[in-house]
Every structure is written in C-alpha cells, then in structure tokens.
Curated annotation (Swiss-Prot):
Gene3D superfamilies: Nucleoid-associated protein YbaB-like domain. Homodimer. It is found in: Cytoplasm, Nucleoid. Coiled coil: none annotated. Belongs to the YbaB/EbfC family. GO terms for cellular component: bacterial nucleoid; cytosol. The keyword DNA-binding applies. Keywords: Cytoplasm, DNA-binding. Binds to DNA and alters its conformation. May be involved in regulation of gene expression, nucleoid organization and DNA protection. One of its GO terms (molecular function) is DNA binding. Pfam families: YbaB_DNA_bd. This is Nucleoid-associated protein RPE_4812. Its main location: cytoplasm.
Length: 105
C-alpha cells in the first residue's frame, strides 16, 4: 500500500512539473532564418508560429517561388530549434532521459 501511495505522489509531482514545463515552453521563443535574414520566423518551443518577417525586396510577383522556398526553409529552421529547446527542457523533467524524436508535449 505504501508503494502505491508513493507512486501516486510521484505521479502528482510529475503532473505538476509537466504543467510548469508547458508554461516554460510557451515562453521560450526561437527564430528560424533563411536567405541570409531575408525571411525570419519566430516560433515558441511549443511549435506555435508567433511572427513572420519578410524583407520587402522579396515581394516581387515574378519571384513568388523564391519567397515560398525561403519561407519553408525558415519554418523548418525554426521548427528544428523549437524541437531542440523542447528536448532540452524535457531532459530536466525526465532526469536526463531524452524524449523520442517527434514526441511532443
């Protein structure tokens, strides 16, 4: 019975830490950059896009494909950085065990 109560207490502590972690991940922001800074994407560590900045020189109707490629690249860069930030925060919660790739909170 004492083991069960201990497990329940640990589960409650883990749940509390997870809520705290969610809040921290929401506050962490990363920036994805492409085209030497022509396109920037700001994203939370929870993978929520917060802002997109596009240099006006890319707003040429004849170059839409270039803008699309740079935007995809900046989003991918931001996503990689957000995933790394999430992994780093999860290591503190799990005592150094890393989260399997693609497993988010």
């Amino acid at each position: 019975m004492a083991d069960f109560l201990g497990m329940m207490k640990q589960a409650a502590q883990l749940q509390s830490k997870m809520k705290e972690m969610q809040s921290e991940l929401d506050r962490i922001e990363v920036e994805g950059i492409s085209g030497g800074g022509l396109v920037n994407v700001r994203m939370s560590a929870k993978m929520e896009v917060r802002a997109v900045k596009i240099d006006p020189s890319l707003l040429n109707p004849d170059e839409v494909g270039v803008l699309e490629d740079l935007l995809v690249s900046a989003l991918a860069d931001a996503h990689r950085k957000a995933e790394a930030a999430m992994q780093d925060k999860m290591k503190t919660l799990t005592g150094g065990l890393s989260l399997p790739p693609g497993l988010g909170l």
